[in-house]
């Protein structure tokens, strides 16, 4: 993308499985915060609908076996959950410093005030709640907030018994 659109400055390709897009946004936020860039594109994509992807998730028993509409099959945190439905997609955000956005008269839709990440070194598909808790504490600390200040959590619900456990 940088070559095609002439984007210059810091760039990297983040590869952290399900957290790739979020890590890309968080790292871009930090680079802007540190003054390494005024604006950055950040996002992720997923393209696992392939023989390898389907075979791997089927072998791990992570795919839903329900015979219903895909929108009804994947049920994160539901007692009757039995796996997810594969899909593909991509998303990219333009992040920039507040000063840069104001200078160009941008419509500001949101502000990132903190970011945290943590590896739990536990299991590839069964996250450990200690690592998850540490990640949230890191984000709160970075934002200068307390847990009482949080009104929304975007959970990683895989609709699998093991993935939704913690």
Where would I find each of the regions flagged by the language model?
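Conserved small-residue
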Residues: 1, 21, 28, 57, ...
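Conserved catalytic cysteine-centered active-site region
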Residues: 1-27, 59-85
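Residue-level signal for alpha-helix termini/capping positions
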Residues: 6, 33, 141-144
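Short acidic/polar capping segments at secondary-structure boundaries
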Residues: 7, 17-20, 45-48, 99-100, ...
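Beta-strand segments within the central parallel beta-sheet cores of soluble alpha/beta enzyme folds
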Residues: 11-16, 37-45, 107-115, 148-155
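Non-catalytic positions within long, well-ordered alpha-helices that form the structural scaffold/packing
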Residues: 29-33, 41
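Acyl-CoA/ACP chain-elongation machinery
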Residues: 38-82, 115-127, 157-164
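Condensing-enzyme catalytic core mediating Claisen C-C bond formation in acyl metabolism
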Residues: 68-145, 151-152
